[in-house]
Amino acid sequence: MSDFPTTARVVIIGGGVVGVSTLYHLAKAGWTDCVLLEKNELTAGSTWHAAGNCPSFSTSWAIMNMQRYSLGLYAGLAEEVDYPMNYHVTGSIRLAHDKNRMLEFERARTMGRYQGLGIEMMSVSDMKDAYPFLETHDLAGGLWDPDDGDIDPAQLTQALAKGARDMGASVQRFCPATGVTQVGDEWIVHTDKGDIRCEKVVNCAGYYAQRVGEWFKPYGGRTVPMTVMSHQYFLTEEIPELKEWTEANGRKVPLLRDVDSSYYLRQDKHGLNLGPYERNCKAHWVTPEDPMPEDFSFQLYPDDLERLEWYIEDAMARVPILGSQGVGRVINGPIPYAPDGLPLIGPMPGVKNAYEGCVFTFGITQGGGAGKVLAEWITEGETEWDMWAVDPRRYTDYTDQDYCDRKAMEVYGHEYAMHFPHHEWPAGRDKKLSPVHDKVIAAGGMMGAYNGWERANWFAQPGDDTSHESTQTWERQGPWAQRIREEAEAVRDHCGVLDLPGFSRFNLTGDGAAEFLRGKITGGLPKIGRMNLAYFADNRGRILTEISVVRHAEEHFTLITAASAQWHDYDVLNSDLPGGVELVDHTKDFSTLIVTGPKARDVMIHMGTDADLSLGWLTHQTAQVAGQECALLRVSFAGELGWEIHAKNANMPALYDAVIAAGAKPFGMYALNSLRIEKGYRAWKGDLSTDYSLLEAGLERFVKLDKPQEFPGKAALQNEKQQGRKKAFANLIVEAGAHDAPYMSTIWH
């Protein structure tokens, strides 16, 4: 009798650490009727050759949460599942060559402290005491991560698999998945051994995730945005001095990361393991001459140490004993990269009951947390922490393969680079352009990418330093500072215009459209001819998204939301759309100008319009402006008198020329951000996320607990109102000296 399952609640495709961790966490949640499929042996893809480093450090709040959870899980896993595991918690030292790096470390330290981590700053003398072989003469300081270390990736994966099996889940090795078929709300996963009918399916296929992802395209999916990179590290022969020190002290030396030189250096037995992230990096399987093989299980690329020559020499100068012995073994294997270097964890865009847990660059340290997050998505439909940073829906239709390849090369070669607040990375740009892009550039626009859309961050004047190097600072002052001040003052004192392409825009029509929205949002709907801001909550009353609702008729709405929210919010709206109600994405058909400031009405009159400019706040109308048909929304995110001019792309050049001729000064996203913070307006995923409830965010006026309709989170918000909120949104004036507080900075009182 065959033990091959023909039904399951969930089928996971891929038996690396992330897939197995997902199975383990599903089983822990009580979902034991789940199956994992692996085409070869567990760990056969990228997991088996991973270095196994386990930092808690990250500059991303979501990633730090995942890694913190992983390390806690790994510490007790061997005992929990009764499986031996080599896990060495050695601590780690990150080296800083200058003040800028120390500032980055300080920000990460405070984030970690808020999460309960013991990350601390280190002096040069402390580093020398902790790592006696380290050359420190040119260092500014460092960062100590006491929880860092290394783990055996294969043992970790097998321990998770044993735990999952012991709870009743199924692992099918040497069982390649060959395709999927959607039947109603369920899936049939095809394999070499037969078909499995399931409720949900998860793509955890590692560097084969793009190939597996193609199976879902007939059902609304897209090509998984990723590129496979070659990552190389080598192990030295035994080093006598290191062996002697280890035996005398009863421990390994800490893991070392020289982030300014872009490598990690770790003790492996009595030798060293050096792993650089080189600028002259190499992508694989991206050309017809180098196709992805059908099976690359437990295989490596040929050694290519010449690429690493500079990094090897630099590391030998930093830790001279590295050069005392020869190379024992070279590992050169495939690692998948998303365009921003962060994994894809969450709902598969456009496909119901399908999920992704793939494209992990640091899958070992993130694997435990990723399995937890995926299991929460699958079983609860929401996650404990806000995970937008890794949500697959953060990427939309602009991520073609050329873009993915360019960004992967850039991110890999700058793996340890600092992400300064005024710096824009140059690779993969100009994917989506405004109808007046050339005019904005001609006016001095210094551009930034927002969900692929190019928008001006600020406007440079002749003689301003616009070099790449000028943005390599955490300081507020730079060539942009005076220009941003001038732009903000123009909006405050006169009138400014911001070209704002890329607003996500949906048309909702049909019998029942209004009642559908009432059952989705926490507040009420606007009257015909008006608009309002509506909030969508999850089942805990936390902030899922915010959308501007423009009402044209009883059952006709335009829904406008952030550029980055396009696929996320489409999923939120489309997931339970009733019959007879139609949702259409018009994002690419229209563009927007923000005309705002105390003289905005005068500017609009000068442009020539038949609009009624006396209509009040949160009204909308269709009008002719500068001879062009457009929609006028009486609203401004800058907090001043103003209108949003929404028009078809073909009409925008004439409108832009007219508003400039009428005296409006171009301003950019940096000035807008300053103005909206001054007003106290919140930004989605900056200030508002699923880490906070609507009541904690101070949005009570957008919550109608007395309305008859049930909506997600209503019961939770009612309970929170009775019990009292645990956190409160606050606007602070902070004396920050020369530096603005970067996103997710911790402020201590």
Language-model features: locations:
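Conserved, structured C-terminal
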Residues: 421-447, 455-457, 476, 552-749
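Central beta-strand plus flanking loop segment that forms part of the substrate or channel wall
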Residues: 51-56, 92-94, 207, 221-247, ...
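Acidic, proline/glycine-enriched N-terminal capping motif
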Residues: 394-537, 542, 670
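Flavin (FAD/FMN) cofactor-binding and adjacent substrate-gating region
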Residues: 76, 88, 97-167, 172-173, ...
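Flavin-dependent oxidoreductases
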Residues: 21, 180-288, 293-301, 310-318, ...
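Dinucleotide-binding Rossmann-like beta1-alpha1 core, especially the glycine-rich loop
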Residues: 52-130, 253, 260-265, 269-273, ...
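C-terminal catalytic lobe of FAD-dependent flavoproteins
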Residues: 153, 260, 269, 283-287, ...
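Glycine-rich FAD pyrophosphate-binding loop
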Residues: 27-47
